A protein has these predicted regions:
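Beta/alpha (TIM)-barrel catalytic core signal, keyed to glycine-rich beta->alpha loops juxtaposed to Asp/Glu
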Residues: 52-177
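Short, acidic/polar
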Residues: 23-40, 86-94, 176
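Beta-strand segments within the central parallel beta-sheet cores of soluble alpha/beta enzyme folds
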Residues: 6-8, 45-48, 84-85
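Active-site groove signature of glycoside hydrolases
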Residues: 34-58
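Active-site mouth loops of central-metabolism enzymes
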Residues: 10-29, 55-59, 167-172
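N-terminal binding-site loop/beta-alpha segment at the start of enzyme catalytic domains
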Residues: 1-8, 42, 75
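Short loop/turn segments at strand-loop or loop-helix junctions that form parts
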Residues: 9-11, 49-50, 160
């Protein structure tokens, strides 16, 4: 087990054959215990609080039972590092600056980095957002990456290839694969 880094999400459940995002603490706890059982381990390295894209959601997570549970699991050694996943640099920045997370899972790629902050992650795929000339990194994203570096918050990347779009010349906002 010591040769692997396990990253797993809190706040996700599998119900009736479907993924569901949840902040209901009973579901969060049951899902996490089920995860440990299914992975046949007594701890995970990174407990990633799933999909926090709005400031309101971050405030609810940070000040509510989800963060309290994550910290409790960390104190018990069931989670080594607390993480958070987000597509929105504004919400992610709040989390990073709070000191409550050790790891940020963030959508990083050459096209998304040119997009401004948005609470709707589906806007990242909207073609009209790429109609304007994209020449500079979004300042909020640049500040987020610098802040993570300065505060020692690790970044784990999601959507490095934009869900595959960046590998397809016709789908890539850059017009090249």
């Amino acid at each position: 087990r010591g040769k692997f880094v396990l990253q797993a999400h809190l706040c996700t459940v599998w119900q009736e054959g479907q993924y569901k995002r949840t902040r209901e603490i009973g579901e969060v706890k049951a899902s996490f215990e089920d995860l440990l059982t299914r992975l046949a381990t007594d701890y995970i390295d990174i407990g990633m609080i799933h999909y926090v894209d709005s400031l309101e959601d971050w405030e609810a997570v940070a000040g509510g039972p989800v963060m309290a549970y994550a910290r409790e699991m960390q104190a018990q050694g069931k989670i080594r590092y607390i993480g958070l996943s987000s597509h929105n640099p504004a919400a992610a920045m709040q989390a990073v600056q709070s000191g409550l997370i050790d790891v940020l899972m963030f959508s990083v790629n050459p096209c998304y980095d040119l997009q401004p902050a948005n609470e709707d992650c589906y806007a990242l795929w909207d073609g009209k957002n790429y109609d304007r000339q994209l020449v500079n990194m979004d300042p909020e994203r640049e500040a987020l990456y610098e802040t993570c570096s300065r505060l020692g918050v690790a970044i784990t990347v999601m959507k490095a290839f934009g869900g595959g779009d960046l590998l397809d010349e016709e789908l890539s906002p850059a017009g090249k694969a």
